[in-house]
Amino acid sequence: MGRGALILALAAATTAPMAGKPPAALISHDAFPGWPSDFEDHPLKPLPLTERESGYVRDFPGRVGRFSDGKREVVVRWVIEPTRRLHPSADCYQGLGYRIVPADSERDSAGRRWSAFHAIKGEQALHVRELIAGADGRTWSDISSWYWPAALGRAVGPWWAFTVAENQDTRAGKSE
């Protein structure tokens, strides 16, 4: 095989995964369906975004909301296109000075698998879990497993990304 043919073959092999469906169709910010009023059978109360979160959402392709159900903080991100701006929550906590300790993934009552970690800073110990859900009902337990299917048009958006944080002391009081 000549050098030109080899380069062409390599280029074709490199771009073949992108030859499928185009990336997610453009979804307008106007298509936003509104924030959920409850989460896991608990009513949600809107909280203001922190200054840091407000800066983050300026260029975010979608919307970000912060809520409390009285015991847990729930950050909800509505994402209209594949983006590297949707990154693992552990990165945010680490950037805020928390020590991150991986935890076993968890299944919720609907059978969806969530990634989980512990975020520890001084005396505060949080249990944090994360899930991304697509418009077609598919879910991903971490951002990296979502990104490439979304970027290659193999995942249907818009997507909802949920991050749930609760004090480990509160969580330890739950009956198993």
Locate each region found by the language model.
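General structural signal for secondary-structure boundaries
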Residues: 1, 48-50, 170-171
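Internal/C-terminal transmembrane anchor helices
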Residues: 1-21
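Aromatic-capped interface at the extracytoplasmic side
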Residues: 19-30
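Short, solvent-exposed recognition patches
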Residues: 33-152
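Surface-exposed amphipathic alpha-helical segments
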Residues: 156-176
